[in-house]
Design a protein with these regions (language model features):
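N-terminal localization/anchoring segments of enzymes in phospholipid and broader phosphate metabolism
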Residues: 1-209
């Protein structure tokens, strides 16, 4: 039988994805590949410590464990310094993990001055929302530093899991024009589920750095 398999260059696939997703191509970027959970959280926490204006976090879930607790403690300290902190997580992503953030945890987080909201909270009939989930993992610090990739906020990215072992995933740190795109993606969702403050880098009291 004749082999009709067609191969497409990987760079062509990337260009097709960018075209269909309406994500603009940018240059003037510095990108760092992060290969482990330990490296990701050390890098992210260090960037958060240096924040002067705002911190934006959008994740599928914040697992209620040691790394999330350390993160929210650090974010609370940044609020005391006058830094605006906004965070979002997916309602299903939170419900489906084995250590979800419950009402009492969210209350404690908000008492630290952190704005935190759920993406698409459960509403009847839930089936209408089953495929409408937010799997993004985005962090933006001061509009200057951005993170995205495959890792949520959970300590198993560092410690692994008993039945699985070491958890392998990747993340990237970005500095440059592409950070503005991550910022706009975050604010577009925040406009719906958080405060009404527009969907541009100048919204929510922000300034393009």
């Amino acid at each position: 039988r004749e082999d009709t398999t067609q191969f497409i260059r990987s760079d062509s696939l990337v260009l097709q994805f960018l075209e269909y997703s309406n994500i603009p191509i940018t240059d003037n970027n510095k990108v760092k590949l992060i290969k482990s959970g330990r490296e990701k959280f050390e890098d992210l926490f260090e960037a958060i410590r240096g924040a002067k204006h705002h911190i934006h976090l959008e994740y599928f879930n914040f697992r209620n464990d040691s790394i999330a607790n350390a993160l929210f403690d650090l974010l609370g300290e940044k609020v005391k310094e006058g830094v605006k902190v906004r965070a979002m997580f997916d309602a299903f992503g939170n419900w489906s993990n084995n250590k979800p953030l419950k009402k009492r945890h969210l209350k404690a987080i908000r008492e630290k001055g952190i704005e935190i909201v759920k993406f698409d909270p459960f509403k009847f009939p839930y089936i209408n929302h089953a495929a409408h989930r937010d799997h993004r993992k985005i962090a933006v610090i001061d509009g200057k530093i951005g993170y995205t990739g495959g890792m949520n906020i959970a300590d198993y990215y560092i410690n692994g899991l008993p039945k699985i072992g070491t958890w392998r995933d990747m993340h990237i740190r970005i500095e440059g024009d592409a950070v503005n795109i991550l910022q706009e993606i975050f604010l577009d969702i925040w406009h719906t589920y958080g405060s009404t403050c527009g969907n541009s880098v100048s919204g929510c009291g922000l300034q393009s750095k």
